[in-house]
Amino acid sequence: MDSGFGSDFGGTGGGKLDPGAIMEQVKVQIAVANAQELLQRMTDKCFRKCIGKPGGSLDNSEQKCIAMCMDRYMDAWNTVSRAYNSRLQRERANM
């Protein structure tokens, strides 16, 4: 019975795991999880803001509201992300 572990971690076949490959895969998994969380939060917030009465389809004003809400959310997220990364770089430079 195969658990599925090991084969995804860049093993060389000799039972040795490459720490660099494992670290890279973990980084990718974290990035995917972060993107999924961002999308879920954006969807939840924009749905609550824009959809008054859920139905079978979105009317024109709901579509526009969703599009604008998502654009603003992503712009805000990008602004915060850039500021955060800039601060991290400054703090690393001061160490």
UniProtKB/Swiss-Prot annotation:
Keywords, alphabetical: Acetylation, Chaperone, Disulfide bond, Membrane, Metal-binding, Mitochondrion, Mitochondrion inner membrane, Phosphoprotein, Protein transport, Translocation, Transport, Zinc
Highest taxon in the source lineage: Eukaryota
Segments traversing the membrane: none
GO molecular function, one term: metal ion binding
InterPro entries according to UniProt: Tim10-like, Tim10-like_dom_sf
SUPFAM superfamilies according to UniProt: Tim10-like (SSF144122)
Compartmental location: Mitochondrion inner membrane
Annotated positions of the Phosphoserine modification: 7
Tissue specificity as recorded in UniProt: Present at high level in liver and brain, and at lower level in muscle and heart. In CNS sections, it is predominantly present in the soma and the dendritic portion of the Purkinje cells of the cerebellum, but not in the glial cells. Scattered expression also is also detected in the brain stem, olfactory bulb, substantia nigra, hippocampus and striatum (at protein level).
Subunit: Heterohexamer; composed of 3 copies of TIMM8 (TIMM8A or TIMM8B) and 3 copies of TIMM13, named soluble 70 kDa complex. Associates with the TIM22 complex, whose core is composed of TIMM22.
Protein name as it appears in the record: Mitochondrial import inner membrane translocase subunit Tim13
Biological source species: Mus musculus (Mouse)
